């Protein structure tokens, strides 16, 4: 996914060609080192930021401070005219209203896995105050076409390259429902209304505490939330799909299988044809075993 973005940036094609400044958000040293290269290759400034992978109160405070500093730096460097708290509150309120339907779809497991994945990906780049009526119409139609799957599988996945829908495609082919977790799904949408006039730190803290993904270090808090969500959705199994360079969850696969009350498959993936074939075979075997046990 990083290489795909870099290719588009260097080729100056698509949305990356229109960027005036990058907010470089990284959880690991490998990505942080990329930012200097990105600035050198494109001539576009990069403001580096660090996203702690461990979810704790201290880390939330650190991240809130990072976002406050980022907003100040953007003003100092002439990229922003300043933070408009009222406008930020209105934007966030519109975003959460629109995201509510997607949250319900991600939680229910009744919207088709491929369609749900496409909607979540499109929504991540949508502007809720910019009249994205076509997208919101698609969300409403997806809700109205809710189906009754044979069973549901929860998916916690690192967002991959567009079109890499290995797990959603496999679930869809079997008529299985998908409960989409992670930062691109249910766990990427905070619940409840935002503050009416939030500061950058207010929103950063709220999102840091609410949003979990496969890059979040699996400490006791994350495990407890995962157990709670799996029980709440009635998922019959859990698939954790991470990239090979991001192995925090793969290292915890034994604890996952011990603590979760449902069967668990942990995929340690790459995007090569051989890697995709191996992951597809393991996923098929897991679903066969899961169906045999129901």
Language model: regions and residue ranges:
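A charged, amphipathic alpha-helical module
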Residues: 64, 68-192
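Trp/Phe/Arg-rich N-terminal binding region typifying the photolyase-homology
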Residues: 1-74, 82-83, 178-185, 189-294
